[in-house]
């Protein structure tokens, strides 16, 4: 990948000038001036997904200039580098190949002169065999009973992705009950252990190194709890499996290394649900549905790697995001799924985006003088409408939003889905076009009221509109369409990182807090007053010690 400061490109300068021309143009004006706007600014994917980006503060000229920025920063070369297995994660000297994990075409992908696909396929086959034994009841616990509950112990990418997907695909789940434990707060593991039976529970310990503090603390607590009932340590092997590469530590824990499922350094944690980390997904929805998930992502991978930038959905969404973040000063983006099963989707891409692109150092090692990753947040609709939409509609912050909904629901109860979708359509219309003072006054007249007598309240009922949104309408949320949707966002994040000249696939920002926690932990082992930190940290630690005594 080339290291190009985007602000030094001619495209950036052209975009800055274009912004000066566009900043006062409204979405309403753009629609009024172009009856074909929806057709020009929307696209479908595989007849499964419609992406409507027409309700944005953009024109064809805007997109052309953003495409020029992508060309000047060599996005096409970066895409080729990633898919060909080059070590684009330079700070860790690693390839970035989550795309290999879902490479259903099985074309060779070479890393260090070796095709990785045979190993990928071997682990997939091993996961298939193991999961079928668990799901069928062939696998027995230490008292001869079949497994009924699965507890996934992991954190970050080893938790957020599998949890999000198993929730999103609940309509496809089998009889096994899934639980996820991530927080080192003992409350998390304690509450899950109250719900399960040691005789019929399988624990998945998800840690590449088998040394992650939070995960291993929870894993040892689960093991201790299990042995209080099982007694003999040899029974651990029937109730624990590992998603790891550290065979020695896995064996010492008591897990049979035959039940250790490997993944590789070229799999980043927040892109790992496609790997052995996805074993909990397979145990929840079955291997065939997991393959469909992979296939949907692979279809989006092919779209991203082969479609011209002008029609490339991840690239278009990425460019629009850069437009708002860097030229309009929008600091956040909201992801708003109108589907209750997707309630963890925003949280998943909060990590996916903010851990990937939340960086102030560029690929040359210099501090940037422009905006990089946005703040990502969101909740399912319609809950959000009764919480934070007020600020999106009438606040002083610009919050570009992605609205996501399925046309077909898995639960066609009465008219619930029509009411849900009526809100989905209404919100983007309201955000784009608002409500003028004239309309508010006319509404009063239609009610037989005199607007002049209600002047004190009229300004509060006016909506400026001009709030940008993307709408992503899925035919239905299936394993295939969910896989494609996740990959769409993954590639959007990668595209923005390339253009903004940052390393998307490392996460050094999580390290300092860990280091300091390891230093502080032994200081909490006694009641001595602490004076080795700043006055604030000393004061907090000493008050903690006083109160726990």
From Swiss-Prot:
GO molecular function: carbohydrate derivative binding; glucose-6-phosphate isomerase activity; monosaccharide binding
Entry GO terms, CC: cytosol
Active site per database record: 355 (proton donor), 386, 514
Pfam families assigned to the protein according to its UniProt record, in alphabetical order: PGI
Keywords: Cytoplasm, Gluconeogenesis, Glycolysis, Isomerase
PROSITE patterns associated with the record: P_GLUCOSE_ISOMERASE_1 (PS00765), P_GLUCOSE_ISOMERASE_2 (PS00174), P_GLUCOSE_ISOMERASE_3 (PS51463)
Substrates-to-products reaction catalysed: alpha-D-glucose 6-phosphate = beta-D-fructose 6-phosphate
First-tier enzyme category under EC: isomerase
InterPro entries per the UniProt record, alphabetical: G6P_Isomerase (IPR001672), G6P_Isomerase_C (IPR023096), Phosphoglucose_isomerase_CS (IPR018189), SIS_dom_sf (IPR046348), SIS_PGI_1 (IPR035476), SIS_PGI_2 (IPR035482)
GO BP term, example: glucose 6-phosphate metabolic process
Disulfide bond positions: none
Gene3D superfamilies given in the database record: 1.10.1390.10, Glucose-6-phosphate isomerase like protein, domain 1 (3.40.50.10490)
Location in or out of the cell: Cytoplasm
Enzyme Commission no: 5.3.1.9
Pathway assigned to this chain's UniProt record: Carbohydrate biosynthesis; gluconeogenesis; Carbohydrate degradation; glycolysis; D-glyceraldehyde 3-phosphate and glycerone phosphate from D-glucose: step 2/4
Family: Belongs to the GPI family.
Record function comment: Catalyzes the reversible isomerization of glucose-6-phosphate to fructose-6-phosphate.
Protein name: Glucose-6-phosphate isomerase
Recorded name of the encoding gene: pgi
């Amino acid at each position: 990948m080339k290291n190009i400061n985007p602000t030094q490109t001619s495209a950036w300068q052209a975009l800055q000038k274009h912004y000066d021309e566009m900043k006062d143009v409204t979405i309403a004006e753009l629609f009024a001036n172009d009856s074909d706007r929806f057709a020009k600014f929307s696209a479908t994917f595989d007849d499964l997904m419609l992406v409507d980006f027409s309700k944005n503060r953009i024109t064809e000229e805007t997109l052309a200039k953003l495409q020029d920025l992508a060309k000047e920063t060599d996005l096409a070369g970066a895409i080729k580098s990633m898919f060909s297995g080059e070590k684009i994660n330079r700070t860790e000297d690693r390839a970035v190949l989550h795309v290999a994990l879902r490479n259903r075409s099985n074309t060779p992908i070479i890393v260090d002169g070796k095709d990785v696909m045979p190993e990928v396929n071997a682990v997939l086959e091993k996961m298939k065999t193991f999961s079928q034994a668990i799901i069928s009841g062939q696998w027995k616990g230490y008292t001869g009973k079949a497994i009924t509950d699965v507890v996934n112990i992991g954190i970050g990418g080893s938790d957020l992705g599998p949890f999000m997907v198993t929730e999103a695909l609940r309509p496809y789940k089998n009889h096994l009950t899934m639980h996820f434990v991530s927080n080192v707060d003992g409350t998390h593991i304690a509450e899950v252990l109250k719900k399960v039976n040691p005789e019929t529970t399988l624990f998945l310990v998800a840690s590449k190194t088998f040394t992650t503090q939070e995960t291993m603390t929870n894993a040892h607590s689960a093991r201790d709890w299990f042995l209080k009932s099982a007694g003999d340590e040899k029974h651990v092997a029937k109730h624990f499996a590992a998603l790891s590469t550290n065979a020695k530590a896995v064996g010492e824990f008591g897990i049979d290394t035959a039940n250790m499922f490997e993944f590789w350094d070229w799999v980043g944690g927040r892109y790992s649900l496609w790997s052995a980390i996805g074993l909990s997904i397979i145990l929840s929805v079955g291997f065939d549905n997991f393959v469909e998930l992979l296939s949907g992502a692979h279809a989006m991978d092919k779209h991203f790697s082969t479609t011209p930038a002008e029609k490339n959905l991840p690239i278009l969404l990425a460019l629009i995001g850069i437009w708002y973040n860097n030229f309009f000063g929008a600091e956040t983006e909201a992801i708003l799924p109108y589907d209750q099963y997707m309630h963890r989707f925003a949280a998943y891409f909060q990590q996916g985006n903010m851990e990937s692109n939340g960086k102030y150092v560029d690929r040359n090692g210099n501090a940037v003088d422009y905006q990089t990753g946005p703040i990502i947040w969101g909740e399912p609709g319609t809950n959000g409408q009764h919480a934070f939409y007020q600020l999106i509609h009438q606040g002083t912050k610009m919050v570009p939003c992605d609205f996501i909904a399925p046309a077909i629901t898995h639960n066609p109860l009465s008219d619930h889905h029509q009411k849900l979708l009526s809100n989905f359509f209404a919100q983007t219309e309201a955000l784009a076009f608002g409500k003028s003072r004239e309309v508010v006054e006319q509404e009063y007249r239609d009610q037989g009221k005199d607007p002049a007598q209600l002047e004190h309240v009229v300004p509060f009922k006016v909506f400026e509109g001009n709030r940008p949104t993307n709408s992503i309408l899925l035919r239905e949320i299936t394993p295939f369409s969910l896989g494609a949707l996740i990959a769409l966002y993954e590639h959007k994040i990668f595209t923005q990182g390339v253009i903004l000249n940052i390393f998307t696939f490392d996460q050094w920002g999580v390290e300092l807090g860990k280091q300091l926690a390891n230093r502080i932990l032994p200081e909490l082992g006694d009641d001595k007053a602490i004076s080795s930190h700043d006055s604030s940290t000393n004061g907090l630690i000493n008050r903690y010690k006083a109160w726990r005594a």
